[in-house]
């Protein structure tokens, strides 16, 4: 019973930590054109059934990158810096940076582009003081669309970089 109580207290502390980080991130992104934030419960590890609150910051790729490029546009640094400032205040989280593309172009090309874009955001965050040991990157190419690729508006939503901010297990 003591273990359950201790686990509950740790869970409550982690929840409050993520609550505060979410509030600070929402404030930092209040006027952002290129980024949005969402919070959801996710099961991170099927074996332990550890479910946690995960914050996801989504950057619209059109604001960060030119078409077919993984080089950050000058205005992208301001948007990324808003996020970096909050990440630096909350070091007890890990960050999974994922790149996504629309379905235009070959699967191989989109996969490589999504990986390069995720790495570009990671490198910018490192340059802004975020500890590289906290971050991993992954490219999904066109495999995880959030909208239809049949319209330009849908393709625009699918071109994105997401940061999943996950509390570290205490």
Show the residue positions of the predicted features.
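Short, aliphatic-rich beta-strand segments
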Residues: 55-60
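Stable alpha-helical elements in mature extracytoplasmic
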Residues: 21, 25, 76-79, 83, ...
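Periplasmic OmpA-like peptidoglycan-binding domain that tethers envelope proteins to the cell wall
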Residues: 98-168
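Amphipathic, membrane-active segments
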Residues: 19-54
């Amino acid at each position: 019973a003591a273990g359950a109580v201790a686990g509950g207290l740790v869970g409550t502390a982690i929840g409050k930590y993520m609550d505060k980080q979410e509030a600070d991130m929402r404030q930092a992104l209040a006027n952002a054109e290129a980024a949005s934030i969402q919070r959801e419960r996710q099961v991170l590890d099927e074996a332990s059934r550890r479910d946690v609150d995960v914050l996801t910051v989504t950057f619209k790729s059109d604001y960060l990158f030119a078409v077919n490029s993984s080089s950050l546009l000058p205005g992208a640094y301001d948007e990324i810096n808003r996020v970096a400032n909050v990440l630096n205040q909350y070091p007890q989280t890990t960050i999974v940076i994922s790149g996504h593309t629309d379905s235009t172009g070959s699967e191989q090309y989109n996969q490589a582009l999504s990986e390069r874009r995720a790495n570009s955001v990671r490198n910018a965050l490192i340059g802004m003081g975020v500890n590289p040991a906290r971050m991993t990157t992954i490219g999904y190419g066109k495999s995880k669309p959030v909208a239809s690729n049949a319209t330009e508006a849908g393709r625009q939503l699918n071109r994105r970089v997401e940061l999943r901010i996950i509390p570290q297990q205490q």
